[in-house]
């Protein structure tokens, strides 16, 4: 049986990443609930005045080295949302004490380099799931843009 594994700490870390990224873009953000039945991704950034959605976002918090992996359904959702809305999608992450992002789709086409690999594992402190080793989208780290 697959279990929802996001903890309160995970959601707090996501919020911190959204705050940094949205401030960098001069936007506001909305974070989807872990229990959302509509979306797998973490949320989006928007213009508070016009209410226009500006981009789609998935967050990853790495205590050490960034892996830049996404499971195939999340990657598919981000790409599909970008194709339907013509808005960009990002993988936003923290590595050590810095943050960065990868532009996955620019609203027109997929712009990141990636491979599909069989990999994964159970993160420390998480409940093991039967699908922890799975096909993952491994994004080339040369695509990373580091924030300030």
Q: Where does each model-flagged region fall?
A:
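Acidic-basic catalytic patches of nuclease active cores, encompassing PD-(D/E)XK
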Residues: 1-36, 84
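Short His-Asn-centered micro-motif
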Residues: 33, 59-60, 92-95
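Beta-rich catalytic cores
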Residues: 39
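Active-site-adjacent loop/helix micro-motif of nuclease/hydrolase catalytic cores
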Residues: 63-75
């Amino acid at each position: 049986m697959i279990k929802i594994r996001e903890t309160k700490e995970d959601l707090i870390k996501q919020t911190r990443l959204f705050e940094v990224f949205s401030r960098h873009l001069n936007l506001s953000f909305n974070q989807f609930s872990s229990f959302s039945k509509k979306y797998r991704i973490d949320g989006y950034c928007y213009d508070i005045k016009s209410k226009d959605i500006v981009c789609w976002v998935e967050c990853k918090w790495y205590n050490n080295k960034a892996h830049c992996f996404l499971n195939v359904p999340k990657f598919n959702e981000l790409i599909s949302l970008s194709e339907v809305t013509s808005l960009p999608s990002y993988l936003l992450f923290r590595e050590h004490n810095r943050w960065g992002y990868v532009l996955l789709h620019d609203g027109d086409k997929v712009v990141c380099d990636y491979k599909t690999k069989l990999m994964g594992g159970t993160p420390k402190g998480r409940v093991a799931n039967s699908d922890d080793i799975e096909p993952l989208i491994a994004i080339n780290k040369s695509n990373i843009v580091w924030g300030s």
